[in-house]
């Protein structure tokens, strides 16, 4: 008996029996899946690295703020409190009482309330220390010099005639609905030949550098009182202004309008602390842990020449300067009265380059280097300006 073949017949063409053919499988492109995995892993690693850096930074900050060294804590606290973009950080690691005790520690040893105007005898033809004419190469009456320290680069602007220095304002009528202006725009509006940032200002309760709308504290401009409300932040007290005899008056406290009228103030604003008064150094400021920050200060020599100091913003080669650094520079340049102005991301010095000292003649040049995080100078309501 023969065995029956149970294997199915082979049909090489299934479609001929009415069955549907299966579509051929698409081949995956080599590398497409690999690229996706690489991208995902890259961002995963990047996110992990950023998270680890943030955690490490928080641990390091906590160690400094709450560690065994009060001096390191105070320096870091003051370095972070002054710039508007970082002043919120110390509050994350310290209670309000400790924070207040650090920032209000700088009580002055100076005994006078105001500087003595009789100390200044204006002599626009005097030299700083020798018989040579220091203005021989400065036909517009403005000299620039630079000074470097271990942690900072500073720019010094000396103005021969104090009567040309005035307080410029971003508007005739300050309002939180009117943003401030940038100093390079303000110098064009005023037709001035030089300028630096001036006093404290309010940013509508934000840290947005685009606002800079209204000042904090008394403001006088060209003989008129422009603002009387508020006071500088972080417990800062002080006033700097020129009277109608073109003498710089520095005060240890924020002036009232009545006091300013009595002192015949023509241009001035609130900020501090006073660094030098009547030739005497403010030792509390000099020896304080004021932190490394970009800084601006205004001072006057005995002959009436006005000295502005502007320390670069934070970047490679310049962490910033302390009050001590600024005082040392002012003393070196013969200043007898000086006051600290707003600093941090506000610190800036500009000059209409009349003779092409820094670039193309006639253009407005930014003399200092402000923060790397800023594309342009921030908006502000007040500026020290130099008229032509």
Where are these regions (language model features)?
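Zymogen propeptides
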Residues: 4-24, 31-232
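Short glycine-rich loop/turn motifs
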Residues: 151-156, 236-237, 292-297, 381
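Beta-strand-turn-beta hairpins that frame and shape the catalytic cleft
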Residues: 152, 162-164, 243-247, 300-307
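Short, well-ordered beta-strand micro-motif
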Residues: 156-160, 241, 299, 385
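Solvent-exposed loop/turn segments at secondary-structure junctions
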Residues: 163-164, 200-204, 255-257, 304, ...
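Structural recognition of the beta-strand scaffold that forms the well-ordered cores
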Residues: 193-197, 239-241, 248-249, 299, ...
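Active-site-adjacent helix-turn-beta-strand microarchitecture at beta-sheet edges
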Residues: 201-287
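Conserved, well-ordered active-site substructure
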Residues: 209-230, 282-337, 346-388
